[in-house]
A protein has these predicted regions:
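Structural microenvironment flanking redox-active thiols in thiol-disulfide oxidoreductases
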Residues: 1-32, 43-48
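Short, thiol/selenol-centered motifs that function as redox-active sites or metal-ligating centers
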Residues: 13, 18-19, 59, 111-116, ...
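Flexible, glycine-rich phosphate/dinucleotide-binding loops
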Residues: 14, 68, 77-78
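Short, glycine/charged-enriched secondary-structure capping and boundary segments
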Residues: 19-23, 54-56, 75
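Short, internal strand/loop/helix patches
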Residues: 26-63, 68-69
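Non-globular targeting/processing and membrane-anchoring segments
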Residues: 73-131
């Protein structure tokens, strides 16, 4: 059974303070982690806005009909909680999809840094979270 994976970086790397999200750094990161899937730049941030992504990382899993079956965390690890990064939450969702089972019922939101939006182009859904 096969699934397609794509990594999308929607952060605005044009601002000097977000240089860690540059294409050069993305290539280095992907090489160091052994990514064997496309890792692309969402230059105009339209992918993030279309998916209503809020943070990095944010995980979305779609079935073969392009229906969203999972949106949530990679796993329960958080800085300082001593839970190992193992991908358990996303893995459970993928396993359910590949085994033609119902999507996992518990879908906890991702935790991470906010997407670095282009100045003045923050989507309404993001601005409403800040208020």
């Amino acid at each position: 059974k096969n699934i397609a994976v794509i990594g999308i970086n929607s952060n605005d790397s044009s601002q000097e303070k977000y240089a860690e999200d540059s294409i050069e750094k993305m290539k280095e990161y992907a090489t160091n982690l052994g990514y064997n899937f496309p890792y692309v730049v969402d230059e105009d941030q339209s992918a993030a806005k279309n998916f209503t992504a809020q943070c990095t990382p944010d995980f979305f899993l779609f079935d073969s009909d392009s229906a969203l079956v999972y949106r949530g965390q990679l796993d329960g690890s958080r800085p300082g909680n001593d839970i190992p990064t193992d991908g358990a939450s996303l893995r459970s969702a993928v396993d359910a999809l590949l085994n033609s089972e119902e999507p996992v019922s518990e879908q906890l939101p991702s935790m991470g840094c906010n997407i670095k939006w282009k100045v003045g182009e923050e989507p309404d859904y993001f601005l409403s979270l800040k208020n």
